[in-house]
Amino acid sequence: MDLLPVEIKVNVEGDVAAALSALGASGRATTVRHIWFAEDRDGAAEGQVLLLESGVILRFRIGGDPDDLTVKLRPCLREQLVGRFSAPFEAKPFTYKIEQDWSANGRVLAASLVHGHAPGVLSGAVAPGGDPATAVDALEDQFLHACTPSVQLDGLIALGPVRSTKIDDVPLDDMDVDLEAWSAAGLDFLEASIRVKPKDEDDAEKLAERAERKQRKLSEAVQARGVVLSERPENKTQRILTALAEATA
């Protein structure tokens, strides 16, 4: 079985602007987008995030070029990913990725199908009264039915917007780190992430050892600049979606 890239994430607590400055992001090019997540309407009315709890994320990103809709399974099992979804592929306007997702609180597998769209095409699906499911096309629907057939996209509501500010490839020691700040529902988060790609000489053990070293280096580099890492068990998607659902209830 092919080795998979590892995305390593650390979350930051406290003053996001101060953390960005301490990590060297000031003056660098930024990408600002607005993000919506689709959730079960009835569940959100009770402050619940049923789609997320079933391991499915539907994320709309608007304001980039292109805009995009991502259908992600996280966590998932490799055995779930069947047929054409058993291996990564790119077929414009689609990109399909399978990655290991590591954080301080665990390691999971994630599979995501990203569909790029022209600016403005997705706006109606996330507008008040809109139906996010109308933006899910045949390939994304096939992905869900093949890999998580118990999940139904009926009665959805768009939760958001979340303001996302992303700064890519910030040099931190000998690493190029992506920084992304999220702001919504009275919450502000910052995530720092790197990717570790398999090398030709890697086996599973070598890749894991290299990723573990990188994970330690990332945490140490962030903390060495006076930035406090989060000790909360939830990732940023869980925290922000829960807050948005509670605000809807």
Name each region found by the language model.
Residues M1-A249:
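Phosphate-end processing signature that detects enzymes handling 5′-triphosphorylated RNA
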